[in-house]
């Protein structure tokens, strides 16, 4: 019995090291596709298209696409729970696959950065982001990674919700496209190097 348990724990730890989960935060539905809050969906959609992988629907909580890149399995997740309950999908799938929170990267919007800026960090508070807060609550740790994508801060008091649920400005089209491309490259670097080693490169080139 002890031998079986040790083998099981070894397999789980191996899976945790070799599998990377990339979670794009956003809201499901065509009405939200181009909104600022959905930049996470945009990045993982673009990466899935770049590696020619299709999305599947293994759970009512999320869509998923899988690929192998740089010798590891990369699991892409889009929660279908709406932003404020995103953590339910992240917790369910990461536990099913035995993926440690330190191998989970959340791709999310950040209004404190201009459009085009990317920044990778591990841990910390939610920064008032309800999707990130939900992931912290459901994983019972803040020790996952966040790839934060700038959406700019063009709103006044009481206008945050309306702002994040509105599309990017037409004048930001080129910066948005470049940021999505760099988001895909960031995922490649994280897969190749691991988040800790990729962080400096991503943040140096994050504009």
What is each stretch, according to the model?
Residues 2, 7-123, 133-147, 154-159, ...:
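Nucleotide and nucleotide-moiety/phosphate-recognizing core
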Residues 158-168:
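The feature captures the short pre-catalytic strand/loop hairpin that immediately precedes
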Residues 149-152, 168:
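Short, loop-centered acidic/histidine patches that primarily coordinate divalent metals
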């Amino acid at each position: 019995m002890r031998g079986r348990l040790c083998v099981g724990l070894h397999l789980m730890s191996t899976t945790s090291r070799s599998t990377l989960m990339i979670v794009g935060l956003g809201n499901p539905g065509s009405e939200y596709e181009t909104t600022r809050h959905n930049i996470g969906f945009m990045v993982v959609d673009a990466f899935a298209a770049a590696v020619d992988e299709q999305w599947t629907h293994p759970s009512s909580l999320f869509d998923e696409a899988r690929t192998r890149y740089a010798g590891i399995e990369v699991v892409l997740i889009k929660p279908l729970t709406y932003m404020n309950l995103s953590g339910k999908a992240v917790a369910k799938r990461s536990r099913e696959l035995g993926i440690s929170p330190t191998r989970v990267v959340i791709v999310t919007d950040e209004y404190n950065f201009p459009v085009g800026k990317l920044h990778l960090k591990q841990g910390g508070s939610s920064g008032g982001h309800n999707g990130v807060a939900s992931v912290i609550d459901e994983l019972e740790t803040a020790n996952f990674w966040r790839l934060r994508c700038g959406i700019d801060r063009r709103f006044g008091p009481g206008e945050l919700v309306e702002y994040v649920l509105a599309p990017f400005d037409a004048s930001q089209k080129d910066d948005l496209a470049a940021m999505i491309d760099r988001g895909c490259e960031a995922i490649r670097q994280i897969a190749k190097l691991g988040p800790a080693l990729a962080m400096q490169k991503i943040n140096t080139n994050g504009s």
